[in-house]
Amino acid sequence: VLGRCMQRHRNGEFIRFLNTVEAAVPAGKTVHAILNNYAAHKHPKVRAWLARHPRWTFHFTPTSASWLNAVEGFFSALSRRRLRRGTFTGIVDLQAAIKRYIAAHNQRARPFQWTKPADAILSALKRLPAPSV
């Protein structure tokens, strides 16, 4: 897990995170980013960054489909195992706890394996009912 703690979550911070991932992924590998529909992910500066990095593909999850985003499971575990009922003296202490959790997680991490082929997942998405307004 590559993690960054940032005070804000705007397009600039997102681009800095993308650059971190870009530097960490070996050359020649394609990168598929699964994202929610947060405005910062679709900002013109982010789109320009994406245009300059052809090995990247963004996939946006449908609204109310956070279960498709594998990082949500990581956030849930982080919350349950480290943050809930935790006591932190401030933001720096909280960020240090998060960084320690990520480091410990990475000591035992294994690659995420989808249990279904991409075609089956995409087909299931098409069967979801349209969101009601």
Feature names for model-found ranges:
Residues 1-133:
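Short functional hotspots at interaction and active-site rims
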